Amino acid sequence: MSPRHRARARRSVVCAAVAAAALVTGSVAAGAYSLGRSPDAASRAVSSAPPSESPSRTPEAAEVTVDLDTVLAAAVEPVVARSGASLSVAVLDTKSGESAVYGEKTYDTASIVKVDILAALLLAAQDAGRSLTAEEKTQAAAMIRLSDNTAATALWQTIGGARGLDAANERLGLTETAGAGAWGLTQTTARDQLALLQAVFGTNSVLSEASRTYLQTLMEQISTDQDWGVSAAGSGWALKNGWMPRTATGLWDVNSIGRVSVDGRVCLVAVLSDGHATKEAGIALVEAAARKAVSSL
């Protein structure tokens, strides 16, 4: 073999080895990656290739898939484990369409249900071909911006309570949410709250553009003493939080849902949690989980 042919053969083997090493490293480091060829098989293919193999032949391209739920769990679980509380989070990148969910537990909504109540009211108004009344607008603004409970109770009655909420949610795409005798005890999941956010902030929604814009605007005007939660994960936020101590245990439910902008991306995030010793501890955990969720995508 001429010197030029020997040099060409050495380059072929080195390139193949580097490609195989990259596959092995990616598999070990990420854990959540599934490769078309196992790392061992790739290593054997390179090490067994004869030196005289033609330079034009390269290892087959490996198909790589990522389980984003697994990636999200790896990011969030250490934070939750240290807290002693229970938490579920769902996140969606609106541009790529990629989403992930951690946790399947059902939680009390507390005041995040106020977004759902207003969505149900707007849907009913659309059906009737009318705008909200002046009184309804006043109540809606107080309910979302200030988290006013009296306004929420009034609008809860207007939409028909739990039955009216459930009927609206069937149309909004929520399948894991059930209204209760008291609006704050409505049961939901992070996955379903993400579906609600898609109905509010997406374009493929039974809510009209005018209804969506109205709800979004109120969520962008949250009182400054309530602008915590998913807003910690980015800027340009619109959100609604919920917090409630449970009488039976003295422990807190702390939830946050909304939209944030991060590094040019727009994400929808829902974080639900319970079992906190204090409201402040719950807020800290919710914000940490929101940041982890957005960065995991």
Located regions from the model:
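Acidic/histidine-rich, surface-exposed loop or edge segments in extracytoplasmic proteins
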Residues: 47-62, 98-102, 118-121, 145-148
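Penicillin-recognizing serine hydrolase domain
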Residues: 2-4, 8-27, 31-51, 67-87, ...
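Active-site SXXK
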Residues: 97, 106-130, 143, 269
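Conserved catalytic neighborhood of penicillin-recognizing serine enzymes
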Residues: 125-178
